[in-house]
Amino acid sequence: MIRVTAVQPESIAEELGLAEGTELLAVNGRELEDFLDWEFLTAEEEFLLHVRQPDGEEIEYEIERPLGEPLGVSLEPARIRRCANRCDFCFVDGLPDGLRDVLYIRDDDYRLSFRYGNFATLTNLKPKDIERIIEFRLSPLYVSVHATDPTVRRYLLRNPTAPEILPQLRHFADHGIEFHTQVVMSPGVNDGGVLEQTLRELYEFGSAILGCSVVPVGLTEFSKHHLVREPTAEECQAAIRLVEARAAVARRERGIYWAFGADELYVRAGVELPPAEIYDGFDQVENGVGSVRWLQRQIETGADELQGWAGRRIGVVTGTAMGQLMPMVLDPLARATGATFELIPVVNTLFGASVTTAGLLPGIALQQALTGRRDLDLALLPGEAINDDGLFMDSMSLDLLSAGVPMELRLSKDFIDALHVPAAA
């Protein structure tokens, strides 16, 4: 059963008399569990819809509509599938007290993997879940492998009953499911020979595995586990050599690069980022893989379209990890627009200075960095630092942040989109 939370005016749902609180029970006699059932089972032009109205009356409708026309209902969020693992590097364990309750939820949900590209370990799948993934062809999935060696993987996940990952992936691959994979590299555990084995076995698995990224483990000052540490520059350099060696094999044999190091891996190693063409279409850019080169490409292809910025001063707020890399993005943007760009790296006051990614910056740190900056016409904030409800990690809203600074603010994941409209005079 799925509950309706809103009905769009002048929609099919409104014509049927559906309302907030209506319970969607079944489609063509099949009970509805969540948004996946709803989307896939109502994809046809004609179907039977069984509902229970707020007054308790149950009605079955025969739906006929043009293919692709939405019914016009908003659904209550699905209950998030909780994680069965206890990884030493779990982000939730590194959160300070006092944040929003939702931030402490350990999610490991294949549905979110398919819909949003969230990485999942697949350790909590039930037989019914496996059947749904295959039936609905939920592909590609984003899978946290970490290690193909079962003993090492179970140690990393702190889950002695975790199923072996390669047979799991094989079963899905035999039914047409593809995967993007990642390894969160924990030094002394799944680097070195273990990482080489993982990359080799995932590559030799076949074309169903579209690629594998290697991301260095990140810890906050609140992390509760002491068996894991962040990698040194030398350890990151060694990992890069393994990644690039596997990428060279893939390039030679398949015409793709397949193996990628996250931008942060290169930053920690003190090694120059590889060129844009090695990222195979930037499929894992949301995972911090190729982010800088992706921004460069957006600027190369779209900066000439930007008008009305000559002489304006723009602050670009980011985490400290990107501070040394952003000039290669901003310098060509400044030349194309005539604007002056100032990079404003911000130390994370919520999680500690060791957390350097822009997406985890709290609103208060952003506000403090911009307070009194009347010399700026505009400040670009990292769009990934705010959620769909308009809140930063510390629950500060964008409106509250804006009220405390003297310049216009814009959220930015793509500089071209953010600067498409000139700043107010």
Predicted segment positions?
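Structural preference for beta-strand elements that scaffold enzyme active sites
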Residues: 140-142, 178-180, 211-213, 258-260, ...
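Radical SAM enzyme core and accessory elements
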Residues: 3, 269-425
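Conserved Radical SAM active-site core
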Residues: 56-58, 65-208, 218-246
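Short, Lys/Arg- and Gly-enriched loop/turn segments at beta-strand edges
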Residues: 30-38, 57-60
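Flexible glycine/acidic-rich beta-alpha junction loops that bind and position SAM and/or redox cofactors
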Residues: 189, 209-235, 254-277, 348-353, ...
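Conserved PDZ fold ligand-binding element
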Residues: 15-33
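PDZ/PDZ-like groove recognition
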Residues: 1-8
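Terminal peptide-recognition signature
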Residues: 13, 21-24, 49, 90
